[in-house]
């Protein structure tokens, strides 16, 4: 099997990242609106696994967002993000290796955490090293046990993925020490259970 970063590099070359943006946009907007509605002062933001940077570009249009950073481990994704947004901040790094120079108020991630062998390690790393006190982590995953239609994705895409249940994901957030944990299914339609969204705050 290929590494996830190699797969995503190939997808950029084939312009498949544009399709990812279109597919993920409804759930991402749901997550961002949930998060933004709970922010009442200026805030900073990281998109973990930013791809071609479309979420960072969107967040930079938000009046209260003072700093938006995109981090991704795929070279071609970061290169494309920088081409599309010469003023944006995009960093090439494995998420487990990255530590921002200053912690942020909101960390978002869509369809990323299950590419890690042990997602709990990444949740803990982000919680401990990326997020300010009272800040929020919010992630979305379509690859989870109850979503039967996704069970062949790892084989079809040719890269390892960590299959977890909805309860497993929620338990990871609880075990990390995050507080005010909520989860829901976003954008259910046509037999698709929906994107599993999990969020919690640092106290």
Residue spans of the language-model regions?
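A short, conserved alpha-helix within the catalytic core of class I
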Residues: 116-126
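Conserved S-adenosyl-L-methionine
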Residues: 178-189
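Conserved beta-strand signature within the Rossmann-like core of class I S-adenosyl-L-methionine
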Residues: 134-142
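A conserved beta-strand element that flanks and buttresses the S-adenosyl-L-methionine
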Residues: 108
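Conserved class I S-adenosyl-L-methionine
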Residues: 1-38, 145
């Amino acid at each position: 099997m290929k590494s996830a970063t190699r797969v995503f590099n190939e997808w950029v070359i084939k312009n498949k990242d544009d399709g990812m943006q279109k597919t993920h946009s409804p759930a991402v907007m749901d997550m961002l609106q949930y998060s933004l509605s709970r922010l009442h002062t200026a805030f900073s933001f990281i998109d973990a696994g930013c791809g071609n940077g479309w979420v960072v570009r969107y967040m930079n249009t938000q009046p209260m967002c003072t700093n938006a950073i995109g981090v991704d481990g795929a070279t071609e994704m970061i290169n494309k993000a920088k081409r599309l947004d010469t003023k944006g901040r995009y960093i090439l790094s494995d998420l487990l290796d990255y530590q921002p120079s200053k912690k942020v108020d909101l960390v978002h991630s869509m369809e990323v955490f299950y590419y890690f062998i042990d997602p709990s390690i990444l949740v803990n790393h982000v919680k401990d090293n990326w997020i300010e006190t009272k800040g929020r982590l919010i992630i979305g995953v379509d690859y989870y046990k109850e979503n039967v239609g996704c069970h062949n994705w790892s084989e079809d895409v040719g890269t390892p993925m960590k299959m977890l249940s909805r309860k497993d994901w929620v338990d990871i957030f609880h075990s990390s020490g995050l507080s005010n944990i909520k989860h829901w299914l976003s954008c259910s339609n046509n037999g698709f259970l929906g994107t599993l969204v999990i969020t919690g705050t640092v106290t």
